[in-house]
Structures are given as C-alpha cells and as structure tokens.
Amino acid sequence: MESAPVKRKAXGTKLLLGRQEHHRNLVEGSIVRIKMENFLTYDQCEVFPGPYLNMIVGANGTGKSSIVCAICLGLAGKTAFIGRADKVGFYVKRGCQKGFVELELYKTSGNVIIKREIQVANNQSVWYINHKSATLKTVEEQVPALNIQVGNLCPIPATRTKFGEFANLSKIETSKKQLKNHVGTPRNVQVPLRIEELHGEKKELAGACKSKAEFLEKLNQRNERYKQDVERYYQQKRHQDKIDMLERKRPWVEYENVRQQYEDVKKSCGNFKDELKKLQGLQAPLNQKIQQIEKRQRIIDEKIKDKAIEIKETSKNCKQKQDELEQKDKQIEEVQQSLRVKRDAEQERQKKIGNIRKMIEDWEKELSAMTNQENIQPEMDSINTDFRRIQDDKANIESEMTDLRMEKDNLEREKKEKANRIKQFDNLMNLKEEKLKRMYSDTYNAVVWLKENKDRFKNRVCQPMMLEINMKDQRHAKYVENHIPMNDMKAFVFESQEDMQVFLKEVRDKQNLRVNTVCAPQEPYAEQRPKRPITDLKQYGFFSYLRELFDAPYPVMNYLCYQYKVHEVPVGTEQTRSMIEKVIKETDLRQMYTAEEKYVTKKSVYSQKLISSNVSLKGAQFLTVTVDAEERQQVVDQLKEIERKCSTIETSMEQLAERQRSLDRRDNELRLRKKTILEMKTKKRQLEQKISTKYDSLNRLEQDNLNLEEVQQQANNRIKNLNVQKAKLVKDLLELMKECTSLSIEKVELALQSTAISSEKNKIESDYKSATSQLRELKNQYDGIEAKKLHLLENCKGLLRKARQACNLGPNQAVPQDFQTAFQSLPESLDEIDAMLNEERSRASCFTGLTASVVDDYNKRTKEIQEVTEELNRKKLELEDYRKNISQVKEKWLNPLKQLIEKINDQFSSFFSSMQCVGEVDLHTEKEEEYDKYGIRIRVKFRSSTQLHELTPHHQSGGERSVSTMLYLMALQELNRCPFRVVDEINQGMDPVNERRVFEMVVKTACKENTSQYFFITPKLLQNLTYAEKMTVLFVYNGPFMLEPTKWNLKAFHRRRRRVAAVDQ
C-alpha cells in the first residue's frame, strides 16, 4: 500500500500528490495526472493517482471534493451534475480572474491531455487537447471515445447528494437510468427503441380502430334514426303541394265572388240616379219664393237701421245735456266744500293759539323753578382733571398688557415648537419599539414592564441597546449592527448585578420572558482613547473609529468599549478595500471595516503568519431610526422653563387686569356725574329755545286772521249763478227726450212688420229644408253605392292580379289546363277551401324541423358509412401485423434482458451473502404488455427475523439504503467496464459494521487485476481496516505546514499506540 500526503495550498506553493509511475497497469482512459491552478481551495496542485484503488482522506473543507470537481469539469461535465454552483466561474479561487484544470488520460497510442481554462469575467471556458486549442464539441467527442461517461451515476456518483438521488430512484427509473445507459449494450439490455415504437404505434392503431368502430356504430344508429325523418319529409311534401294548390285556387274564388258583387252594385247605382233627378226638379219653385221674401226683408231691415241711427244721435245729445247738469252740481258742491274747509281752519287756528299759550306758560314756570347753576363749572373742571389722569393710567396698563401678551404669544409658539419636537422624538422611539415588538415580542414586553417599574432599581437601567444607540449618520448603521451581535443588541444594560438579578427574577422567572441582560463594567472603558489616532489611519481610507459614529448612554458605551472594542475598530471606504493587503500588513489592526466588508485578522498558531478573513456587510435593520436622548431631555427642560415663564406672565397680567377694572369703575363714576351736570345745562338751554320758538309760532297764527262773513257772501253768489245755468239745461233735455220717444215708436212698428215676414220665410224654408234633406239623403246613398262600385272594381282588378300571380301567369295568359284540372277536384267556396287549408296545414305542422337537407344528409351519411367500413377493415389488418411484429421483437429482447438481470442478481446476492444478509434483483412489471413500465426491483433483508422488502426511501434506514445502493452499483460495475470510478463520502450515515464490510468489498473489488481505476473519497476511517498493497492512499491536510511523512517518528507513533491499547485493557 502506498501513501502520499496531500497538503492544502499556500500561497505560491506547488503541491505534488501521489507517485508519477504505475503507467503499465492503467486501463485505457484512466487518469494519469490531475493538475489544478487557482481552482476552488487550491492555488496550484498536481495529483498522480494509482491504477487501482485511490483512497483520498482528509478533514472536511480541506479540498477533497475539489479533486472530484476537477475530474468532472475537466472532462466537459456540466455544473448541474456536481450540484455545487450553477456557473463555472464560481469554481475559480476567490480573488483570481482565471484558473484551469488539466487531466492526462492514459492511451496506448499516446496519452491525451485535456485542459480547461476558466475565465471569471465572462464565465467562459477555453479548451485545449494535447496543448492545442480545441472546441467543447471536440472534447465531448474525445471523452466518450475513451469509454468515459461523466454524467453516469454508475462510475461517478460523485457526491452524497447524487448518491442519495440514486438511492431514491423507483423501479422504473432505476431501469431506465441504469440499465439503459450504463450496463450492457443497447441490443441485449435496454428496452429497444423499436419495441417501444411498435407498442406505441400498436396502441395508437388499436385506439384508432376502436374510435373508427365506435364512429361507424354512431353513423349507423344516426342513419337508422334519420330514415324515419326522410319518410316523414316526403309526407310533409305531399301535404305542402296540396296547400300550394289550395292557395292558388283561393284567389280565383275570391275574384269570382267580388266580380258578382260588382255587377249587383252597378245595377242599383242606375236606379238611384233616376230618382235623384226627379227630386231636383220639384225643389226649384220653393227656392224662387224664398228669394222674393228675402228681398222684402232686406228693405224693412234698412228702414229699421235708419231709425236706430236717429235714435242713437238723439240719445247722444240727451246724454251730453245730462253730463252738463251733473257738472253744475259738482261745482255747487265744491263751493260749499270750500266754505266748510275755511270754517274748520279758523276753528283749528283759534285752538292752536290757546294750546301754544298754555305751553309757554308751563315752560316759563319750569324755567323759573330751576336752581342757580353758577357752582357747576368748578366741579366740571375737577371731573375732567380726574378723567385725564385715569386715562393716562389705563394707557400705561394697556401698554404693559400688550407687552406681556406679545411675550406670552412668543412663549406659546416656543412651547408648541418644543412640544412638537418632543412628539417627533417620541414618534421615532415608537417606530423603534414597534419594530422591536414585531421581531422580539418578549424583549418588548420587558421594556414595557421596565418603564412602569423603574423605581424598583437602585442604579440606572438602560433599555435594549438597539433602542438606546442613536446613529449620528444613518448610513453608518450597518457597521454597528454587523459589529454587535443581535443577542447583545436586544440586551438590557445594568450598572449593578443586584439590579440585574431583580430584573431577571421578575421578567424571566415570573413572566417567563426570554430576554438578554448584561452588566456594564465598573472601570471607565468608555473614556479610553484608541491606541492610534484616526489621523494616522486616514492614509488608508479610514475616516472614523466605530465609537465616534453613534451616541449611547454611558453604561451602554462603557460595555461596548469593554466587550467589542468599538473605540479601536476603524471604519474605512472603498479606498481601504482597494489596498486591503497593505492595510493588513502595515497597521496590525485586528478588526476593520471597509465600505461594504468586515475584515478580521489573526496569527496562525503554526507559522505565526497573519491570516485574514472577510465577510460582506448585511444591511441595517434597527439603527436606521435615530433618537438623541440628551437632545430630547434638553428640549423637555426648555419646555418646563417656558411653562414657568408663562405662569409668571399670567400672574402679572391678572394683577394689571385687576388695576384696570378698578380704574374702569372710577371712570364710570366720573362719566355718570359729568353726564348729570351736562344734562342739567342742556335742559335749561332747551327750555329757553322752546319758549322762543313757540312765541314765534303764536305770532304767525295771530297774523293769519280770516273774515268768515265775507267768505259766506262770495259762496252764495257763486251758487246762485250755477242754478240759473242748470234750469236752461233741464229745458233742452226735455225737448230731446220727446224726440227720442217718437223715433222709438216708429222703430217698433217696422220691427213688427219684419217679424211677420220672417215667420212666412221660416215656413217656406222648413218645406225647402225637408225636400233638401230628402235629396241629400238620396244623394248620399247614390254616392255610397257609386263608391262601393268603384271599390269593388278596384278589388276585382287586384284580386285578378293576385290570382294570376299565385299561378305565375302574365296579364293576357290563360290558366293552364293542369291547374284547371286540379282546381276542379278542390272545393268551390272560400269556407270549404279555408277549412281544407287549415286541415292540411295542421297535418304539415306535425312534421316540424324537416328540410330538404335531411334527405341530403341521409344520402351523404350512407356513402360515409361505406367509406368508414372499408377503412376500419384495412386498419384491423394493419393491427394484426403489428401484433405479430411485437411478438417477434419481444422474444429477441426479453430473454437477453432476463439473463443480464440474473447476472446482476448473482453479483448482488453474492455481496449480500458475504455480509450475512440477503439481497435480490429481478425484473418486475404490473402488466406484461406495458413494456415502458418494466422496472428493476431490488429487495433486501438485513436481519434474519424479517422478510425480503423492496428497497424504498421509506422502509429501510439511511445506512441500510446506502449499503444496498453501494452494493448494487458495485454489482453493475462488475458488468460495465469503464476507465475509472469515483465515489465521494458514500460511507457517511453507515453504521460501523456495514461501513467496514462495504470498505472491505470496495478494496477487494477495486484491487483485482484488470479492474478500473477507483477513487474513494472519505473524511474518516474506521480503525483496523483491511488494506491492499495495490491501494494508493492520498492524505489531504488543512495547510502546508504539517510535518512531511518522511520525517514522521514511527517509533513514537508505536509507543503511543501501545499506551492507548494498555489503557483500553
């Protein structure tokens, strides 16, 4: 057995794994050499595997699977098969722009070297074969030519994930994915494509035959059903022909009936015309007599009209005289009325004179009764002086009140601004608390309890750090959140252990809330300065230490400086990131931040060299909302001071208001006294003015004296003259009235004559009207008959046209003989024709939904039935041929397949027997004819007390499935020859007993002569395993500084082993 250590990369070192020999025992296509550069964990590494079993052992994360990835990708494998990353660029070592994988494959005519160079920038690969540029297609053709199948789970299960996928395959999937692709040849193992095609075509043909037969049956049934419709259609047509003939005859019968009526009416019309002429001859004399009477009547009416004109003229003159008399009466009344008005005016004048004298007398008495007013003016002057002094005091008070009011308004505005600012602070804090409530409800409930019970603690207690920390710039919140773990971000900070125990007893023990607490140190770590000023680090892009980016209460800041050294962790920019290697070497910083990453450096315990790691920063979640507690407290203090000032101003304003009310009362008293004095002076002046005015009015009334006797005499003379004029008018009126009476008598006599003539005229007109009425009635009867005659004539013409149209005849065309013959067999009256029409229509209506297309469809369907019958017979012959072909192909396919599965079963059973277990493999199907559902069934039994059970993802344990799957793959591998096989950590999950048995089988199988090259990758090994001389063991260590195997002290190893054995005993 050969062993060679495999060490992880160091920068700049080249690793050689294995021995560069063994070419004589290699199978064509085996791997001679694997070279990797900037690939996954390796800077540069070259592996030389042995021809038989190559066991690669190393701790997790050392790079074992990187060798498997190199084999898959170097042989044109897809990244999806590896299941590690979807883009090939991700397989290049971090920080490098390109890398490559190179594989040398053994070939008798000359080894083949395949190189894949991977570019990170464009995620592309460049291929080389024997150091010459090639295409992916050329590589994909070259690899299968060496019998290498990269995507085949049989030679390369590759990873535990792919191995688990294989273990979870169903019977049918196992058959298709393994036997079809990985064992035997297509001719004697896989379900031949031809039998699947024949079976599919046979199914399609059988389905087509079945559908055609069903379709033919439906056609026959439908045609049989429509046969009755055809017969009914012909019955309907016979009824319809009779209806058409009745509809043709009916207009001719209507025409004949109307023509007969026309002849009868034409005869009656001649009789009425003769009688009308006779009555017109008798009416002429009466008309002449009426005209003579009307002439006499007109003469008398003219005379009556003349008398009426004369009477009207006379009456008009009488009316005129009566109007003149009425006018004279009005004039007399006006004179009398004027006399009465003057008498009343004189009486009123005398009354007013008496009243005015009485008023003057009373006012003079009141004026003489008023006291002397000489002492009023000094009192008035004193009142004015006091009034001016009060006004000055009130103005001063108002000025002071205005100043205080303005000052108070300013303070109110400031008070409102401060209150709004506090509200803004509270809103921001509420946002932080709401976020805390959503994500950590227990911590939030503890915060609520703390606010209500702060008096229970002796020292200061700070809320969770995420609430207490306030960023100076929200953009820097991500640095603080990435630096402080979330458990501390949501932790309460105490200054004493005693307070913390009180809090935990209440919150954790009683309320069962899950909260974190920390106790700030007593030493003043928050006051410590960084070892190096930030100015010294600005050349590297650093702009601040972490502590300077936020504010927090002293206990919180003290704890953060103590626990997380926030005062010594600098924050940089993209400039820092671009020169990070220089920063790490020159600054000796243990932690630092760039724009988007956090870097941590430490010294290796082996080499004392600096080792750095970096992580990308997560986005801030809690500290994006900033609340400055000190500023809020300042605003609260300012608000209290403003409220105190407002209270002082209100007290001063109340005092001034009381003084102002006292001055107002004194002012009202002075105003009332001044008003009283002024009213006394005003009243005296008014009395004097009134007396003077009334004396003037009295003088004017005494001067307006009137002589009533003279006025009476003038009125009497005026009335006397008017009475003389009235007497003359009455005399003229009487003469006119006599003349009007004479004319009225003459008019009455003429009216009597006119009445007698009218009576005679009415008698003659009555006789004339009677004759005229009789003549009119006869004329109306004649006109009605004449109109009826014309109507019947037009009706006859219309009916004749209609009858000809019904028979499709021209204006001068005679009725065809066949129509006349058909008409003779039909009824002659309209009632009989209508009755027969209704009967035939009723019968025809029983055949609804029938058209000529029914007959056409019936004929077409009959023809289609013949065609479908011929096609069905033809397909049945084809189906029989397919059955014969499938039977022949089945015999050629199924027997070799059963033989192959028997061989697999022999190998599988042998492997299980060597483990004192039972295993079987057989060909299984539910239905013999469903060839695409043939599957390989694997049944296993691990305990003697159980039965054989099919291998499924649910029945066996994970270790039992791994063992079964591995042995099944080994059974397949005995039948499938390939250059090399790879298994990666398949022993994970196996119990020690099965793992040992499987390992021994792998060693035994892989180390036989003429076997394929084998790569067995594992992170662990059991003790006291059986190894073979032909094995090659490759150890992969976690660094380049491990002791070389040539320098191992084997004697010391043996001594330690003996001591361990002695302790175990």
From Swiss-Prot:
InterPro entries: P-loop_NTPase, Rad50/SbcC_AAA. ATP binds at G58, A59, N60, G61, T62, G63, K64, S65. Residues 210-439, 629-797, 855-893 form a coiled coil. Keywords: ATP-binding, Cell cycle, Cell division, Chromosome, Coiled coil, DNA damage, DNA recombination, DNA repair, Mitosis, Nucleotide-binding, Nucleus, Telomere. One of its GO terms (cellular component) is PML body. It is found in: Nucleus; Chromosome; Chromosome, Telomere. Gene3D superfamilies: P-loop containing nucleotide triphosphate hydrolases (3.40.50.300). One of its GO terms (molecular function) is ATP hydrolysis activity. Residues 438-628 are annotated as: Flexible hinge. Forms a heterodimer with smc6. Component of the SMC5-SMC6 complex which consists at least of smc5, smc6, nsmce2, nsmce1 and nsmce4a. This is Structural maintenance of chromosomes protein 5. It comes from Xenopus laevis. The lineage of its organism: Eukaryota, Metazoa, Chordata, Craniata, Vertebrata. The gene is smc5.
